[in-house]
Amino acid sequence: MKRREFIAGGLAGGVAFALGTRAQARGQAQAQTGGASEAEKLARLSVMTYCFDRIVKGLGKPDDPDRTLDILDAPQMITDHYGIHHVEMQHTHFQATDKPYFQEMKGRLRKANSQLTQICLEFDFVDLSSKQKYQQLEMIALSKDWIDYCVQLGCPRVLLNQGPLTPDVVEDAKSTLKQITDYAKTQKVFCDIENRGGGRPAPNAPPNAPVRGGWEVLVEVLKAGGGYANPDIGNFPDEESRAAGLRVMYAMTSGNSHAHYAPDRYDEAKAIGIAKEVGYKGLFSIETSARNNGPDPYAAVQSVRDALLKII
């Protein structure tokens, strides 16, 4: 072999070895961080417009100078600010429900290459725990309307408000939910419900006051009523119930979960770890609060986004 060929061969071998070593190191690093790129992780994040509730235009305060965000601009804003292409909206943020408005919303979503993932229904006077028959019928009727709106908007799910689920209303809640989900299935829309604490007396509650149902009661209602769980990582009274509840609820989802960031209250990485153990492959929808994440909603969402990218 000529000296030039020997040197060239040695250089090629050294380059191949170096590239292989770097690729192996990258593979090991990815394995240590869950094996996903940042783009793949961002594809599993969504942002709740509830995070911007204090600055969304309208909501009965048309002249409030602090309300600067037009909800039609939210999909593009979320894409531009955070690189996230999934949006979860409050039903109260829609400024109309007619066909032209929905066409405009769909166009804005399409332009941002974004997907409306869930509409959260927070009706003022009715929920699944409503006791009076006329209230239950109104809950069913309003929910059906928004299920139809989901179809028009290409949204796969609604989030229903379960109310307190105290022992005296659980059976009625099951029946009301079943009537809603029976209709939703014909429209191919999922009906989700999130956990909202409960399981123990509320602070300063009077003696013998009914206890709000915890995650166990919610699961019972979901199973009887044909709904799906929307695990909310933050909404548990303690670590023991969080660990137990998430293991059950992540196995009952339609693909959406609410994720906060409050390290002084609980271990977010541990909670996400439970989702991984159960095999959850759905979305983590960012939910912020001024108490946990500061008064600036844009910075608050950024902080939760950055924290989640490190652990999902």
Predicted regions: what they are:
Residues 157-171, 202:
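Divalent metal-binding pocket/active-site signature
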Residues 2-152, 168, 175-178, 185, ...:
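N-terminal pre-domain/capping segments
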Residues 64-65, 205-209, 233-237:
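Short, flexible loop segments at the rims of nucleotide/cofactor-binding pockets, characterized by
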Residues 237-287:
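Glycoside hydrolase catalytic-domain groove-lining segments
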Residues 91, 162, 261, 287-288:
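Short secondary-structure boundary segments
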Residues 86, 192-194, 230-232, 285:
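Generic enzyme active-site microenvironment
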Residues 200-214:
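Active-site-proximal segments of metal-dependent phosphoesterases and phosphodiesterases across multiple
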Residues 91, 197-198, 233-235, 290:
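Short, glycine/acidic-enriched loop or turn micro-motifs at the edges of active sites
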